[in-house]
């Protein structure tokens, strides 16, 4: 599942507030996404992260 993938901020220099599921804590956590080169563990809202990863 992509919920278990590590957080990836990406290689671009954008500033997009997002959430990822932290498998160590079992919680959805905010981070800043650069805009490209990320992975599936990247959600626009806390609700979306919690719904998909069951946090």
From Swiss-Prot:
Presence of keyword Disulfide bond: yes
InterPro entries xref list: Kunitz_BPTI, Kunitz_BPTI_sf, Prtase_inh_Kunz-CS, TFPI/VKTCI-like
Subcellular compartments: Secreted; Nematocyst
SUPFAM superfamilies named in the record: BPTI-like
GO terms for MF: aspartic-type endopeptidase inhibitor activity; serine-type endopeptidase inhibitor activity
Residues the record marks as site: Reactive bond for trypsin: 13-14
Transmembrane annotation, as ranges: none
Keywords: Aspartic protease inhibitor, Disulfide bond, Nematocyst, Protease inhibitor, Secreted, Serine protease inhibitor
Entry annotated with the keyword Metal-binding: no
Disulfide bonds: 3-53, 12-36, 28-49
Gene Ontology cellular component terms for the protein in this record: extracellular space; nematocyst
BPTI/Kunitz inhibitor domain boundaries: 3-53
Additional note from the record: Does not show effect on crabs.
Function description: Inhibitor of serine, cysteine, and aspartic proteinases.
Family: Belongs to the venom Kunitz-type family. Sea anemone type 2 potassium channel toxin subfamily.
Protein name as it appears in the record: PI-stichotoxin-She2b
